[in-house]
Amino acid sequence: EEDGFLHANKTTLGADDGVGVCYMLALLDDESLKHPALECVFTVQEEVGLNGAMGLDKSILKAKKMIGLDRGKEKIITVSCSGGRRAVVEKELSYLKNESPCYQLYVGGLQGGHSGGVIHLERGNANVIMTRVYYHLSLNNIEFLLGSFKGGLKDNAIPRECVSVFASNDDFKKIKEVVLKVENDLKEELKESDEHVFVRLEKVDSLNEVISVKESQDIISMMYLMPNGFMHKSLKMDLTNISLNMGVVEMNEKFNIYFSIRSPMESAKDELSNKLSLIASMFKAKYVLDNNYPGWNYDEGSKLRKQYVDFVKETEGITLKEE
């Protein structure tokens, strides 16, 4: 506390929750206000997985209507919220000694962004692009042995960069021609969202270990089939309803692909999970659900929302924006 203000210690996370806490404490503190019975719920660890809310015993609550105050902006009301699901596809790897020249692929120049906020802008995903480059090498009968693959930092962030090293005995000029063709196609396809996208190819020192051609092709084929990005929007509101993001790819003892799946509908999250699980099983990989939290879908006939919107319009002359 400083000069009558409470400050977070070295973080701004939770500031929107803090506004909601203040609203509730002010209502509880002012005995002059007239209102129906209130049940104020305070939970912890929202930013790391809604841990407090997930552990709440809902049977202790008697109220039939709920107002969520996890919002810091004024003149805007939240009328729907995507639930989320974090998942990983894991594939065991068998390394072998490398005896071939090595090359590095680097995908960059992308804007990226939070998958919960800008996925509808359909920006390029570096992991998806890297997969596409490798798949087109296969289409042109170029054999490669994966040695490393690293893209993205967080499952819910659209990856801006991806770096991968592979070994190949095929002609470098032929490899370069394929990579350049894919890069030119991407520049045309993404000129409205990621005009600076690039795919860079260069010779590097040989790696000691790589995985086989068959295992490399299986991984790339599996990733190439996996859905990614913006899927569906609400026709009632201009909001994304279903999406998923191939946020992180890592190659170590295992090949791991981390996804963030988002939708206010559990059934939609289930469908995307089922697709990922099925594709993984086709290539002897494992689908693991890491975390799941619910959302809520838009209720077109909400009487409580209409009462609030009408009241603010009547008393403040403000037309609230719904998001």
Task: Write out the residue ranges for each language-model feature.
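Alpha-helical metal-binding/catalytic segments enriched in His/Glu/Asp
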Residues: 2-47, 103-107, 114-138, 167-169, ...
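Acidic/histidine-rich catalytic neighborhood of metal-dependent amide-processing enzymes
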Residues: 7-94, 98, 147, 234-237, ...
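Predominant activation on well-ordered alpha-helical scaffold segments within soluble catalytic domains
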Residues: 21-29, 64, 127-135, 176, ...
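Metal-dependent peptidase/peptidase-like ectodomains
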Residues: 57-126, 183-187, 191, 243, ...
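Acidic-enriched catalytic cores of C-N bond-cleaving enzymes acting on peptides and small amides
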Residues: 96-100, 119-150, 169-243, 276
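A structural signal for small-residue-enriched, beta-sheet-centric alpha/beta enzyme cores
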Residues: 116, 150-159
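A short, glycine/Asx- and small/polar-enriched loop/turn
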Residues: 157-162, 253-255
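An extended, acidic, His-containing surface patch that forms the Zn2+-binding/catalytic region
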Residues: 200-245, 250-252, 262, 266-271, ...
